[in-house]
């Protein structure tokens, strides 16, 4: 199975100070992962909003792409090809889930609010006793 990462999952993996960094990294090993232009651009936007320079954010993304070699897929579907988009809320998330579905994949996310059969919520870390 291949998982297309949404922006939240990619940011949590690449930003060590992110509150869900450990959660995503516990789920990550051994999985086949993919990114697309939307998730890459989203990472750059969020990393800069968190205080990174664009140059540093681009370097982090480039190192990830080089070292972890996720599958890259183009955004080759028109928005109108995503029948699951029925409201203005979550349009990008649903588009990404439909993009993954078109390839027989799932969308890896930290967002509990994505109502799509292909959206897989990355599980919480177990709480120690």
PLM feature spans:
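Short, well-structured N-terminal submotif of metal-dependent ribonuclease cores
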Residues: 1-35, 49-59
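A structural signal for short, well-ordered beta-strand segments and their strand-loop junctions
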Residues: 4, 34-37, 72, 107-109
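Short glycine/serine- and small hydrophobic-enriched flexible loop segments
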Residues: 45-49, 101
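Short, conserved alpha-helical segments within structured domains
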Residues: 39-40, 92
């Amino acid at each position: 199975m291949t998982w297309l990462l949404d922006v939240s999952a990619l940011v949590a993996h690449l930003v060590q100070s992110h509150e869900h960094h450990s959660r995503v990294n516990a789920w990550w090993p051994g999985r086949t992962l993919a990114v697309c232009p939307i998730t890459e651009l989203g990472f750059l936007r969020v990393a800069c909003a968190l205080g990174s320079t664009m140059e540093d954010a681009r370097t982090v993304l480039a190192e990830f792409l080089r070292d972890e070699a996720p599958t890259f897929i183009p955004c080759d579907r028109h928005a109108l090809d995503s029948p699951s988009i029925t409201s203005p809320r979550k349009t990008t998330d649903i588009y990404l889930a439909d993009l993954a579905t078109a390839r027989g994949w799932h969308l890896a996310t930290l967002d509990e609010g994505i109502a799509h059969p292909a959206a897989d919520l990355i599980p919480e870390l177990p709480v120690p006793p």
